[in-house]
Regions:
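N-terminal helicase ATP-binding lobe
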Residues: 1-504
Length: 504
């Protein structure tokens, strides 16, 4: 990892100006707009009605579309699988204005081209496969998939299609057949391509918690210990915070990526890398307030970097923090600033390092009461008590907040030197070591990201086969509903079972 504290090169400045792709920009806009509402989300999938973009009486439109496009598919399934389901639609609802009817028919060729992408057809294909599986284990795959697909945030799904699918799932209920799901959890849950492809795009819970904390109106400062797995959006979280941010990182590429994202959103930023004093801070054009334009081209070619009124985020390396802090203090009230320190433990695993003195100086001379310490491996509060005490002595009214997340969508298993998956129940020889491991893991759940879901499912099934579990810890009692069984809930369940093991 490149930890050199140097100014940006010309090529690095040019890199910042390359726009992110449309998909990434949409996610960045979601984070930015979460400043006002952390519950916003979107889904790229479209229902039939959303695709044709027609307004009017929804009941009439649903009835007409069902009768014209979905009825035959549904009736074929009813006949083939002998289903006792009847869908009655009043004839008056099926009649559509001739102009609207013609408009829809004119879209038939387009509908045919993207039919497999329309949400109702995705649901109907899944329910057909569910029925086709009969008593096979794979039936559970489609049941679990449909339960989650129906929860997605898709506007105006045809209500008759929804009714048909829900009736089947209710009458063919396999809700309590947890064993089949857990046995195949790798394929049915973690690597479920349908759920991955059609899921909602929304904030992680730890981001919601962070934004609620930092965007609330309050007079006192706050130190937030922000611990969440790698790859879950921590380094983009500054975009969702209303306060003016001083983002500090040891690794230049992390800062560059955040800067590029900010520029794509047209957020006014400044860059402080390799600074020897405040005059080395550079403004991006979006942040420039006083500048000179080229008379012929009209482009900005000289910026007064000493005027930083417009800067919302300043991105700094470790050695430039104090310069960045003083620069931002010149234009903002202290309580309107936030020091966002990315990976504060970097280099601390060395006995000595050139950064240690700089880190100590930054902490000692810091004047900003709002601080976020962000890392996947951030020590727990009790392990950094002297640091907490120092913060409280400097900011007596400051609050301490822990945001600890272990949510993750992908497992990155740990493989031992022999090529086998490493898990607590596989690598420890003594009961005492397993118990010590569980105790540590309960306080450091971000490590769960490295626990293989396949080995977890084998362990869970083994525990049930040996019948030594108390009733309340058996899967049917532990999980209230089948949709509660997720990658992360299985990993927590695994820890629970490990903690309940008896020595004999």
């Amino acid at each position: 990892m490149d930890l050199t504290q140097k100014k940006l090169t010309k090529s690095e400045w040019e890199f910042l100006e390359v726009p992110v792709d449309k998909k990434e920009l949409k996610i960045l806009n979601l984070i930015f707009n979460s400043r006002e509402n952390v519950e916003i989300k979107y889904n790229e999938s479209k229902s039939f009605l959303e695709f044709i973009k027609m307004n009017g009486n929804l009941d009439t439109l649903h009835a007409y579309i069902y009768n014209s496009y979905f009825k035959n598919l549904v009736n074929n399934m009813i006949d083939k699988f002998n289903l006792q389901i009847k869908i009655d639609i009043p004839k008056k609802l099926i009649r559509l204005k001739s102009a609207d009817s013609i408009r829809i028919k004119n879209l038939n060729s387009k509908i045919k081209d993207i039919r497999d992408q329309l949400y109702e057809y995705i649901l109907l294909t899944s329910i057909y496969n569910y029925l086709k599986e009969g008593k096979n284990d794979r039936k559970m795959f489609y049941y679990y998939t449909l339960i989650h697909l129906l929860k997605n945030d898709i506007k105006n799904i045809n209500k008759y299609v929804i009714y048909f699918i829900k009736e089947i799932l209710i009458t063919n209920n396999i809700q309590k057949d947890y064993k089949k799901l857990i046995k195949n959890s790798c394929e049915y849950i973690e690597r479920n391509t349908l759920l991955i492809k059609y899921c909602n795009v929304e904030l992680y819970k730890h981001q919601k918690d962070l934004f609620r904390n930092m965007n609330a109106n309050r007079k006192n400062g706050k130190l937030i210990l922000y611990q969440a797995p790698t790859g879950t959006g921590k380094t983009l979280s500054p975009i969702g915070i209303k306060k003016k941010i001083i983002f500090v990182c040891a690794a230049k590429h992390i800062g560059l990526q955040l800067a590029k994202s900010c520029i794509s959103l047209e957020i006014p930023i400044a860059i402080a890398f390799g600074c020897k004093d405040i005059s080395d801070i550079r403004l991006h054009y979006f942040a420039a307030k006083e500048f000179t334009k080229h008379r012929r081209t009209g482009q900005i070619f000289r910026v007064d970097n000493s005027v930083g009124d417009k800067v919302e985020i300043i991105i700094s390396d470790i050695q430039s923090y104090l310069y960045s802090m003083r620069y931002m203090m010149a234009f903002n009230e202290l309580n309107d600033l936030c020091w966002y320190w990315d990976e504060p433990t970097i280099t601390l695993d060395y006995e000595t390092h050139e950064f240690h003195e700089i880190l100590q100086k930054n902490w000692k001379e810091n004047e900003i009461p709002n601080i976020i310490l962000s890392s996947a491996t951030l020590p727990n509060q009790k392990d950094i008590f002297p640091m907490i005490r120092n913060y409280k002595s400097k900011f007596p009214l400051g609050e301490i907040e822990n945001i600890i997340s272990y949510e993750c969508k992908k497992t990155i298993p740990i493989i031992d030197s022999n090529g086998y998956v490493a898990m607590p129940h596989l690598i420890f020889d003594t009961f005492k070591d397993i118990k010590s491991s569980v105790k540590f893991l309960m306080n450091n759940k971000t490590i769960l990201r490295h626990f293989d879901i396949g080995e977890i499912s084998k362990f869970i099934l083994y525990c049930h086969k040996k019948t030594f579990l108390k009733e309340r810890y058996k899967m049917l009692n532990y999980f209230e509903k089948i949709e509660d069984i997720t990658v992360i809930s299985l990993k927590i369940y695994y820890l629970e079972l490990l903690s309940k093991l008896k020595k004999d």
